[in-house]
């Protein structure tokens, strides 16, 4: 379930910018699926077996627009109404607005909150993910979920070669995870995927904030889809 198309978080590495997704508008120009709550209710009303409903895989459910449109909240209300479970992935502490609904879903079925943590360094975070709350704010959101007995999972991704692939960064994030009592950590290796559309944007941001880094990527990985290293930098 993806309620929006496009994103305003501005993450420099975002795979969803890729041309393979055939987005016909600017990535920051958000397409809104305004009838999503109606379609969701129709589908859940007819479903004979309960299951987990997932959201956040392609577009964050807590974009800036959500503050006014409240599409995500309306869908959570429907999920809670029909007794279904929820798995929700976000980078935003706006999820705290809906903690009351998340608690009710957890009480009646199952609710798992997944949150992406990329870098322990707050200054670096504001470059890599400029228009969303920082890692420390996300850690605070995880702590709130812990206090409400809502299980959490962290996506430790992506690990960008030469940027956040340090032992210090990984230890910092793992300490956050341990302290917040997360139930699982997902990591897809030491690297990032780049393809047409997102590669060009990523390289432009490297030129802007990390002069010379693009050339280091080109020397190390060429045009490879997977840009990964086998070792962290100490």
Predicted feature residues:
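Conserved Radical SAM active-site core
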Residues: 1-114, 118-126, 135, 139
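Short, composition-biased local secondary-structure segments
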Residues: 45, 110-114, 138-148, 208-216
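A short alpha-helix capping/helix-coil boundary motif
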Residues: 53-56, 119-122, 151-155, 217-222
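Short, electropositive alpha-helical surface patch
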Residues: 69-70, 103-115, 164-180, 206-209
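Flexible glycine/acidic-rich beta-alpha junction loops that bind and position SAM and/or redox cofactors
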Residues: 123-129, 158-165, 183-228
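Nucleotide-binding/hydrolysis machinery
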Residues: 132
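Conserved C-terminal portion of the radical SAM core fold
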Residues: 136-197
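Conserved small/polar residues in nucleotide/adenosyl-binding loops
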Residues: 232-234
């Amino acid at each position: 379930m993806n309620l929006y198309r496009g994103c305003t978080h501005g993450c420099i590495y975002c795979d969803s910018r890729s041309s393979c997704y055939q987005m016909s508008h600017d990535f920051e120009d958000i397409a809104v699926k305004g009838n999503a709550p109606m379609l969701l209710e129709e589908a859940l009303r007819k479903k004979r077996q309960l299951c987990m409903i997932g959201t956040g895989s392609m577009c964050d459910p807590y974009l800036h627009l959500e503050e006014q449109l409240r599409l995500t909240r309306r869908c959570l209300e429907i999920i809670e109404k029909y007794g279904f479970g929820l798995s929700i992935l976000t980078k935003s502490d706006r999820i705290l607005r809906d903690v009351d609904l998340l608690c009710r879903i957890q009480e009646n079925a199952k609710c798992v909150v997944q949150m992406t943590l990329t870098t322990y360094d707050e200054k670096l975070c504001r470059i890599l993910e400029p228009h969303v709350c920082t890692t420390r704010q996300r850690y605070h959101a995880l702590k709130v979920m812990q206090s409400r007995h809502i299980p959490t999972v962290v996506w430790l991704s992506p690990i960008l070669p030469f940027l956040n692939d340090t032992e210090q960064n990984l230890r910092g994030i793992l300490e956050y995870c341990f302290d917040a009592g997360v139930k699982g950590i997902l990591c897809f290796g030491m690297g990032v995927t780049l393809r047409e559309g997102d590669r060009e944007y990523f390289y432009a941001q490297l030129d802007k904030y990390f002069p010379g880094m693009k050339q280091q990527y080109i020397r190390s990985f060429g045009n490879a889809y997977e840009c990964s290293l086998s070792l962290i930098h100490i």
